């Protein structure tokens, strides 16, 4: 990362440069060394993008919000899609990503949230709407995380759906949908013994599929 942060006040910061996109969800916030494998949306996401952001911590010490305006691309439209670019779709003149995030803490820190909404101007007439709802429940020796993620893509940025349907449709899928659930449970048996369970699922679909049974 290469960015500059300016403290506008004790609780408000402005950052610009190459930023970590504030996608939301606890899976994304974990140190990669603590993740055996990521669910598909995070695995295929471009997490470090050029742009600017502002964040604010509220006086109650329990809530914070952030807003980012980012260049949604780490490579050109041609490099991203190549020959799979649909002939009816033109690249966006301003490929921007708008990201809003809210973090909250309730019940003396027993319940925490990191919720976000992101809008991508992926191409002309093809946008992406991404929701991430991260929840954390904490007891004495037990922590439970649950993330719900929903990515509605006017043009299949991740390419998973496109690779599945490539035999019947040679271009990047339009109107692809990704819906995911991620659960992580941690139980501290003893000071040096921590049990960990991670369960996840990922559903991909092509809303433009001409086969109603497909």
Residue spans for each PLM region:
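A short secondary-structure junction signal
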Residues: 27-28, 66-68, 76-81, 114-115, ...
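Solenoidal tandem-repeat scaffolds enriched in leucines and small polar residues
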Residues: 74-77, 81-89, 96, 104-106, ...
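Outer membrane beta-barrel
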Residues: 1-74, 104-107
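Detector for outer-membrane/organellar transmembrane beta-barrel domains
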Residues: 95, 100-209
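Outer-membrane beta-barrel initiation region
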Residues: 66, 91-93
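Extracellular loop and loop/strand-boundary signature of outer-membrane beta-barrel proteins
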Residues: 35-40, 81-88, 120, 166-171, ...
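Outer-membrane beta-barrel and related beta-rich outer-membrane complex signature
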Residues: 26-30, 77-81, 156-160, 209-211
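Short intrinsically disordered, low-complexity coil segments enriched in acidic
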Residues: 2-7, 197, 213-214
């Amino acid at each position: 990362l290469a960015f500059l942060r300016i403290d506008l006040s004790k609780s408000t910061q402005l950052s610009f440069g190459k930023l970590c996109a504030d996608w939301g969800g606890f899976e994304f916030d974990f140190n990669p060394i603590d993740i055996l494998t990521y669910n598909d949306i995070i695995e295929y996401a471009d997490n470090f993008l050029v742009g600017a952001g502002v964040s604010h911590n509220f006086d109650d010490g329990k809530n914070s919000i952030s807003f980012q305006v980012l260049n949604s691309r780490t490579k050109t439209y041609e490099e991203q899609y190549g020959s799979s670019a649909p002939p009816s779709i033109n690249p966006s003149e301003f490929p921007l990503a708008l990201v809003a995030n809210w973090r909250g803490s309730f019940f003396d820190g027993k319940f925490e949230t990191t919720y976000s909404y992101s809008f991508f101007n992926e191409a002309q007439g093809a946008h992406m709407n991404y929701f991430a709802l991260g929840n954390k429940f904490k007891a004495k020796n037990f922590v439970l995380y649950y993330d719900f993620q929903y990515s509605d893509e006017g043009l299949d940025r991740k390419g998973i759906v496109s690779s599945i349907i490539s035999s019947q449709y040679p271009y990047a899928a339009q109107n692809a949908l990704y819906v995911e659930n991620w659960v992580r449970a941690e139980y501290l048996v003893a000071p040096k013994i921590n049990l960990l369970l991670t369960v996840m699922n990922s559903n991909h679909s092509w809303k433009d599929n001409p086969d109603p049974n497909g």
